[in-house]
C-alpha cells in the first residue's frame, strides 16, 4: 500500500489544531534557530518546523550513527518532508520523446538530539545583536519603502491590506497592548501585501472565487498570512502572541480547509516561505 505523504502531513497538522495547538505558533525558547539538521546546520523549512515537536538538532538514524551516536531503545521518530525530482518520459506531437522532471513529496524519519546518546549537543545562539523590536521595525520599514506600500494608522479596531490601493491600515500604535502585538499584526498584513501580482502573485489563485470571511479562499489566504507572520516573528526574535486570529472560529475554518484539501498545508507553508523571503529581500 502506497503512503500518501500529503495525508500524513495534513493529519499531523489537523491533530494539533484539534487539540487547540497552533503549530506555527511555537513557544519562544530564546533561540532563533528553531529546528535544524545537525549535519548540514541548515534550518528546517517552515512546514517541517510545524511538523517537528522540538527546536534544536535533528538528524536521520544514519546521520546520528555516523556521528558516533545511537538512538535510545524505545524512542520514536518524527517525519520531515522534502521534494525529490523524478525524470519522466513524455511523447511530443511530432513523435519525439523528451525527458521531464517532476517534483514528488517524500519523507524521512528523524530523531531529536534528546533521543540520542554519544553525541554532545551544539552550543545554541541565544543572544541578539539587535533588539528584536528594532529588527522588526527595520525589516518592515525597509519592505514598505522598497515596495512603496502606503501605511495608514487610524484610530479604530481594523487592520487590513487593500489590494486595490496597495495600502496597509493599522490601528494606532498606542492602541495595542504591547509592541509585540503591534508587530505581529503589522507582519500579518505585510504577508497579505505580498499577494500582489508584481510580488508573489497569490491574487492569481483567487480569480473568479468568492473571498469573504468564512469562505475557503479567505481561510486559505489567512493561513498563509498567519504562518508567514509567525515565521517573521521568530526570525526577529519576538514571541508570537496569541490573537483573535487563533480563536475557535479561525481554527475551525482552517480545519475545514485542511480536511477538504490534504495538499493545502504543503502549499500554504510554501507560499508563506516565499512571502517571508520576499519581505526580507531574499527572493
Regions found by a protein language model. Name each.
Residues 1-283:
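N-terminal accessory/interface modules of nucleic-acid-binding and processing proteins
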Amino acid at each position: 500500500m502506497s503512503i500518501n505523504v500529503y495525508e500524513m502531513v495534513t493529519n499531523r497538522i489537523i491533530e494539533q489544531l484539534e487539540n487547540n495547538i497552533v503549530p506555527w505558533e511555537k513557544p519562544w525558547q530564546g533561540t532563533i534557530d528553531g529546528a535544524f539538521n545537525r549535519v548540514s546546520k541548515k534550518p528546517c523549512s517552515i512546514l517541517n518546523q510545524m511538523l517537528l515537536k522540538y527546536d534544536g538538532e535533528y538528524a536521520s538514524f544514519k546521520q546520528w550513527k555516523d556521528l558516533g551516536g545511537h538512538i535510545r531503545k524505545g524512542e520514536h521518530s518524527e517525519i520531515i518532508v522534502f521534494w525529490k525530482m523524478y525524470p519522466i518520459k513524455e511523447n511530443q506531437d511530432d513523435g519525439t520523446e523528451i525527458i521531464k522532471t517532476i517534483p514528488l513529496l517524500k519523507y524521512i524519519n528523524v530523531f531529536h538530539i534528546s533521543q540520542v546518546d554519544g553525541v554532545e549537543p551544539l552550543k545554541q545562539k541565544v543572544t541578539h545583536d539587535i533588539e528584536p523590536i528594532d529588527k522588526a521595525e527595520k525589516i518592515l520599514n525597509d519592505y514598505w519603502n522598497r515596495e512603496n506600500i502606503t501605511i495608514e494608522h487610524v484610530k479604530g479596531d481594523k487592520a487590513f491590506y487593500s489590494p486595490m490601493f496597495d495600502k496597509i491600515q493599522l490601528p494606532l500604535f498606542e492602541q495595542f497592548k504591547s509592541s509585540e502585538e503591534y508587530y505581529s499584526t503589522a507582519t500579518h498584513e505585510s504577508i497579505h501585501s505580498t499577494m500582489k501580482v508584481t510580488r508573489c502573485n497569490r491574487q492569481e489563485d483567487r480569480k473568479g472565487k468568492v473571498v469573504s470571511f468564512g469562505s475557503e479562499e479567505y481561510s486559505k489566504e489567512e493561513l498563509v498570512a498567519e504562518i508567514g507572520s509567525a515565521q517573521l516573528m521568530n526570525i526577529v526574535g519576538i514571541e508570537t502572541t496569541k490573537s483573535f486570529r487563533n480563536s475557535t472560529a479561525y481554527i475551525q475554518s482552517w480545519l475545514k480547509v485542511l480536511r477538504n484539501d490534504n495538499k493545502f498545508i504543503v502549499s500554504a507553508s510554501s507560499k508563506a516561505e516565499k512571502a517571508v523571503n520576499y519581505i526580507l529581500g531574499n527572493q
